[in-house]
Regions:
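ATP-dependent adenylation/nucleotidyltransferase module used to activate substrates
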Residues: 1-181
């Protein structure tokens, strides 16, 4: 007979076992989207089910202008699990690529010079420019996150750090492409 097939959940649990065994510093990047939400919940469930006595770092880049339902979801998950999460909610005016302006190549969330038109206030407990000595005005959002990873590793005095990012690799595999070209 053939091998017993494992499902995605079982394989994820095996990987989490290795991660939580091998790394002293684990950080999940959580945008509030489906992929990062599933990953964060898998980690939360793993910690609780295995009764681990450690906290999980969560890195959330708060872009100021987000759907209210996404903000509510992020707030709800972080609050409900604050006993096991060490949250780094980042509200920094790094550069962010934009395609909504003919005049600007980028915009800045939480730009202090534009405070009068902010969509909302900085959430309580968020980390701002003052918390990050490596931040510069020239920094792009993804450049910031690379520096953040090094900063967190040093701050935690970690031996081995693991940064988890939930990204779908295959979507909608049940759909089929038409066999004849469209006319």
């Amino acid at each position: 007979m053939g091998e017993v097939q494992k499902n995605v959940y079982e394989l994820a649990q095996e990987r989490l076992h290795i991660i939580f065994k091998e790394f002293d510093n684990i950080c999940v990047s959580f945008s509030g989207g489906k992929d990062s939400g599933v990953l964060l919940n898998l980690c939360i469930d793993y910690i609780r089910r295995n009764n681990l006595k450690r906290k999980l770092s969560v890195y959330h880049m708060d872009y100021e202008i987000q759907y209210s339902m996404t903000i509510d979801y992020v707030d709800r998950i972080l609050e409900a699990n604050k006993d096991i999460l060490e949250v780094y909610r980042v509200c920094v005016p790094f550069k962010v690529t934009t395609c909504t302006s003919m005049y600007q190549n980028y915009w800045r969330p939480w730009d202090p010079e534009m405070r009068d038109i902010w969509v909302r206030n900085i959430p309580e407990g968020s980390m701002t420019v003052e918390n990050f000595p490596f931040y510069t005005d020239a920094m792009w959002d993804y450049e910031f996150q690379m520096h953040f990873a090094k900063w967190l590793h040093a701050r935690k005095d970690a031996v081995r750090s693991c940064f988890l990012i939930g990204i779908r690799t295959v979507s909608y595999t049940h759909l089929t492409l038409p066999t004849t070209p469209y006319v």
